[in-house]
């Protein structure tokens, strides 16, 4: 019996599951549990990838790990904008000013904005649904992080029960929330201003 059998899921015929089952019944298996997808922050960021199966948290941000501090840009977004001849200093600064989101940058085509939504712009129901789709092929469990800008007792209860009804073994690993007060964007603003003469302004 495979994991997907216990979930009542019929897999595609891409792989020969019958032959694998026959080999296991004949020869046994070394480990009873094989899969447990987990966050891999340091290695993921160093190699330019996002953590595990998580949605991206920002299209441009700095990341501190045990290995040091790194400036991270969404390389896939950059590639798409370069193809459209749209990647430039102004766009980069606008993304920073919008806290890593591109949803308010209307010069970027809608299909690109839809493709690169950050985690705060994605319904958690979709994240839980995708976790359930993976769950049928994960024998142990998965480290599922969820995000809510302003979590409440009702929203958390609803989220937990939805995941439970979908059959998730781990309801939640970390709950991420936004800080009540956002840090001031000292480094960049949506528009650059000419520097004024300090002596002249007296």
What does each model-found stretch correspond to?
Residues 11-14, 23-30, 35-191, 201-202:
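Catalytic alpha/beta core of large soluble enzyme barrels
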Residues 194:
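Residues immediately within or flanking Cys/His clusters that coordinate Zn2+
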Residues 1-23:
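Short glycine-cluster motifs
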Residues 198:
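Cys/His/Pro-rich metal-binding microdomains
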């Amino acid at each position: 019996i495979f994991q997907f059998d216990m979930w009542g899921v019929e897999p595609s015929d891409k792989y020969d599951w019958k032959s694998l089952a026959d080999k296991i019944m004949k020869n046994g298996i070394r480990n009873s549990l094989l899969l447990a997808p987990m966050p891999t922050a340091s290695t993921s960021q160093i190699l330019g990838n996002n953590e595990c199966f998580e949605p991206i948290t920002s299209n441009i941000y700095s990341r501190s790990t045990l290995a040091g501090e790194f400036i991270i840009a969404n390389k896939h977004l950059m590639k798409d904008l370069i193809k459209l001849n749209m990647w430039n200093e102004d766009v980069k600064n606008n993304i920073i000013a919008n806290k890593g989101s591109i949803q308010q940058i209307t010069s970027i085509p809608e299909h690109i904005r839809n493709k690169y939504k950050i985690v705060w712009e994605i319904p958690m129901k979709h994240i839980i649904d995708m976790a359930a789709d993976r769950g049928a092929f994960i024998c142990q469990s998965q480290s599922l992080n969820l995000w809510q800008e302003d979590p409440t007792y009702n929203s958390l209860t609803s989220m937990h029960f939805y995941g439970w009804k979908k059959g998730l073994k781990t309801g939640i690993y970390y709950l991420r929330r936004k800080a009540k007060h956002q840090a001031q964007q000292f480094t960049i603003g949506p528009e650059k201003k000419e520097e004024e003469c300090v002596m002249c302004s007296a």
